[in-house]
């Protein structure tokens, strides 16, 4: 059978199921694919195939995740489901799966539990814009008041973590009922997908953001000038445009792009995702180096202080064997750059144990081009000991 071409006609959205252990996240994921498969919009995936999640490595951290994809009438979704709570924490903090929105599953029989709260908090900290609630196991609750109570608790919890608790769609259903083909519960899965289509916003495309390219390598071509190579992170750069070089003391030096090359071919422009070489006018080879970024003038600022949400690897994951304390100074690997920084722990936190997820303040030894949402690894002696993302810039 010929390989299917990736259909670009529908907008693409990344979502996932989050929530407390045994509330039915994986059953719901299987139910979504089963119900949509009947409408020809998905490939059927069994509970077991999703539950036996393969290991993946992202920024040196091993995470178990299952990826499924499906379509609705309006969108193409890539959906992530993780078997264990620790996998969720790692997944959301390291960005192995960037979520544009999430379905939070809560069992009507239990109501919100500690991990329900923890996942909502994590979603807030890593800037997941909106959540949709699926109240599961409603076929096991006869009391309407009990359902209303759980719904009220969920709305309060969402509002507490600065989501729109009043307007967030809450769908009452039964994932197992839908998986077993009960029409009443299949309809609820379709209702859930409609809620995702309308409530979860389309993510801004990388190509529509300002141009930015981290420099990976630099070389000079005799008679033509200096070429900087790298993968364009966001935006578009055209031949003849003015750009700025930032970071590592480049002090915002400006230049003009006189050529864009990809695979030894000349292009008129490079766009997000392309690996290119940019020919820069009037820039000496020693004025630009790996770790700097090239961008449109005035679009990116340098910062040396920020707050971040981080996950610290366990010993079994190749991380530290011992905790670290306040003022710990590891290297931060940001884009293509290793830079030393000092960690300040939250008030009242004496130390951080391997396996912890914590909010820290970081002060780098020199400013680096960075923005909220940017992900990084924490390294010590060349090995990854943690990963995280910037949640707030300070200077």
From Swiss-Prot:
Residues that coordinate or bind Mg(2+): 26
Q: Where is it mostly found?
A: cytoplasm
What does the UniProt keyword field contain? Answer: Cytoplasm, Elongation factor, GTP-binding, Hydrolase, Magnesium, Metal-binding, Nucleotide-binding, Protein biosynthesis
Q: Where is this region: G5?
A: 174-176
Which InterPro entries does the UniProt entry name for this protein? EF-Tu_GTP-bd, EF-Tu_GTPase, EFTu-like_2, EFTU_2, G_TR_CS, P-loop_NTPase, Small_GTP-bd, T_Tr_GTP-bd_dom
Q: Which reaction does it catalyse?
A: GTP + H2O = GDP + phosphate + H(+)
Chain positions recorded as GTP binding sites: 19-26, 81-85, 136-139
Pfam families associated with the record: GTP_EFTU (PF00009), GTP_EFTU_D2 (PF03144), GTP_EFTU_D3 (PF03143)
- Which PROSITE patterns does the UniProt record give? G_TR_1 (PS00301), G_TR_2 (PS51722)
| NCBIfam families documented for this protein | EF-Tu (TIGR00485), PRK00049.1 (NF000766), PRK12735.1 (NF009372), PRK12736.1 (NF009373), small_GTP (TIGR00231)
The record's function comment reads:
GTP hydrolase that promotes the GTP-dependent binding of aminoacyl-tRNA to the A-site of ribosomes during protein biosynthesis.
Name the chain's protein. Answer: Elongation factor Tu
Q: Which organism is it from?
A: Parabacteroides distasonis (strain ATCC 8503 / DSM 20701 / CIP 104284 / JCM 5825 / NCTC 11152)
Mind giving the lineage of the organism this protein is from?
Bacteria, Pseudomonadati, Bacteroidota, Bacteroidia, Bacteroidales
The coding gene here is: tuf
């Amino acid at each position: 059978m010929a390989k299917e071409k990736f259909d670009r006609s529908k907008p693409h959205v990344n979502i996932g199921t989050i929530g407390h252990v045994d509330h039915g996240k994986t059953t719901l994921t299987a139910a979504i694919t089963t119900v949509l498969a009947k409408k020809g919009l998905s490939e059927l995936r069994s509970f077991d195939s999703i539950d036996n999640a393969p290991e993946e490595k992202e920024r040196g951290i091993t995470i178990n995740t299952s990826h499924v994809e499906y379509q609705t009438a309006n969108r193409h979704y890539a959906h992530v489901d993780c078997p264990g709570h620790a996998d969720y924490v790692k997944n959301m903090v390291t960005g192995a799966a960037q979520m544009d929105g999430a379905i939070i599953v809560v069992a009507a029989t239990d109501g919100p539990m500690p991990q329900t709260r923890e996942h909502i908090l994590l979603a807030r900290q890593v800037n997941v814009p909106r959540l949709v609630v699926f109240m599961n196991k409603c076929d096991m609750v006869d009391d309407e008041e009990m359902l209303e109570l759980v719904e009220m608790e969920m709305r309060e919890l969402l509002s507490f973590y600065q989501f729109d608790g009043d307007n967030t769609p809450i769908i009452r259903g039964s994932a197992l009922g839908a998986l077993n083909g009960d029409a009443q519960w299949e309809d609820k899965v379709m209702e859930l997908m409609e809620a995702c289509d309308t409530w979860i916003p389309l993510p801004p495309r990388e190509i529509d953001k300002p141009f930015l390219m981290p420099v990976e390598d630099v070389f000079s071509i005799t008679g033509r000038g200096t070429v900087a190579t790298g993968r364009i992170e966001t935006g578009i750069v055209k031949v003849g445009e003015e750009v700025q070089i930032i970071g590592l003391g480049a002090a915002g030096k400006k230049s003009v792009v006189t050529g864009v090359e990809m695979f030894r071919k000349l292009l008129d422009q490079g766009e997000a995702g392309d690996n290119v070489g940019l020919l820069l006018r009037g820039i000496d080879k020693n004025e630009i180096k790996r770790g700097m970024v090239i961008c449109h003038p005035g679009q990116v600022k340098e910062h040396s202080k920020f707050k971040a949400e981080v996950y610290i690897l366990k010993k079994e994951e190749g991380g530290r064997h011992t905790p670290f304390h306040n003022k710990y100074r590891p290297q931060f690997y940001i884009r293509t750059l290793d830079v030393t920084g000092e960690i300040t722990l939250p008030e009242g936190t004496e130390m951080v144990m391997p396996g912890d997820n914590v909010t820290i303040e970081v002060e780098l030894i020199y400013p680096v081009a960075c923005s909220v949402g940017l992900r990084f690894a924490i390294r010590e002696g060349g090995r990854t000991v943690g990963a995280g993302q910037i949640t707030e810039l300070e200077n």
